[in-house]
């Protein structure tokens, strides 16, 4: 088959496009990045737990992602540095999650055109996640002091150059949505901190570091 024949050109363009699909935006640092937005009155050190709920059944987030993100958010923006004593529990619970893939019809169109649009950054599809989570604050005895709810959404494009790879996009969509939900909860904790702090301090120190039914890192 000659390269300059129609079939040869089609094969060459398709091979080039498929090889280039790996040239997507880097996710390096994206999963570990935590914004700095410290609340006005930090809470005392707490045991940090997480229940991924329906997120555990999603194809995107890794099992350790909810706890890791929650822990990073609290340690950077909400809690005082931990030494040895803790004065209660902070528990993240993911209550709702829905991820949809849109634009997949574009893939069929691009196959017909030998993926040439992909070479120029045309999207293949989007991963969109809607998520709801709540944070429960408890004293050392496990008594609930307050529940704070947030919602997050995301839309992650799968594309060369201007988007992310098909491998990373589902996880990134879940992580962005969860991070947005935590960002909504942060100002609620800021407002409640003047009430929560004395209740946690007077409740004493934690003797059992892990709440039943929770995960702890």
Q: What does each model-found stretch correspond to?
A:
Residues 1-24:
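Sec-dependent bacterial lipoprotein signal peptides
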Residues 22-86, 94-101, 151, 194-217:
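A structural "domain/chain start" motif
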Residues 93-145, 167:
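Surface-exposed short loop/turn segments
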Residues 3, 79-80, 130-138, 180:
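A short, hydrophobic secondary-structure junction motif
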Residues 89-92, 182:
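Polar alpha-helical coiled-coil and adjacent low-complexity
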Residues 29, 124-132, 144-217:
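C-terminal/domain-edge helix-coil "capping" segments
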Residues 15, 39, 83, 124-126, ...:
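Sterically constrained small-residue positions within well-ordered secondary structures
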Residues 58, 62, 119, 123, ...:
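Conserved aromatic-histidine-acidic binding/catalytic patches
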